[in-house]
């Protein structure tokens, strides 16, 4: 298991330390480190502190903040930026951009699990500037070009 440095910025997390819920879990739950409930009306967004800061340190790693599937499907609560990308050299607190895309008001409770954090490998690349690409079967065919079924 790869280990990274984590700062706990909210003491309430000392009893809710980040952990994988199951041996096969890809993401760690992020909690809403709020002092009071926050109400999100339909269409509203807000930044919610996670109470955590991470330092991946390895440029071969990045972290992604992703929505929790149940919140999105059942309540319409997703991420305002769709995916949050945490670079390996970022050391500040992780915030969750919560967006209520649903039709009903939703209240985020203090310490509620609001998103998940997934650490992924990253490959930085260099560019070869070319005038043309070698021919491929697909070429520049875009959206829908590989068929419906």
Swiss-Prot record:
EC code: 3.6.1.23
Any GO molecular function: dUTP diphosphatase activity
Recorded catalytic activity of this chain's protein: dUTP + H2O = dUMP + diphosphate + H(+)
SUPFAM superfamilies: dUTPase-like (SSF51283)
InterPro entries membership: dUTPase, dUTPase-like, dUTPase-like_sf, dUTPase_trimeric
Coiled-coil residues: none
CDD domains: trimeric_dUTPase
Cofactors named for this entry: Mg(2+)
Residues the entry annotates as binding substrate: 68-70, 81, 85-87
Pfam families: dUTPase
Pathway field: Pyrimidine metabolism; dUMP biosynthesis; dUMP from dCTP (dUTP route): step 2/2
GO biological process, one term: dUTP catabolic process
EC primary class: hydrolase
Assigned keywords, A-Z: Hydrolase, Magnesium, Metal-binding, Nucleotide metabolism
Annotated PANTHER family: DEOXYURIDINE 5'-TRIPHOSPHATE NUCLEOTIDOHYDROLASE (PTHR11241:SF0)
Family under the similarity heading: Belongs to the dUTPase family.
Alphabetical list of NCBIfam families matching this protein: dut, PRK00601.1
Protein function: This enzyme is involved in nucleotide metabolism: it produces dUMP, the immediate precursor of thymidine nucleotides and it decreases the intracellular concentration of dUTP so that uracil cannot be incorporated into DNA.
Protein name: Deoxyuridine 5'-triphosphate nucleotidohydrolase
Phylogenetic classification of the source organism: Bacteria, Pseudomonadati, Pseudomonadota, Betaproteobacteria, Rhodocyclales
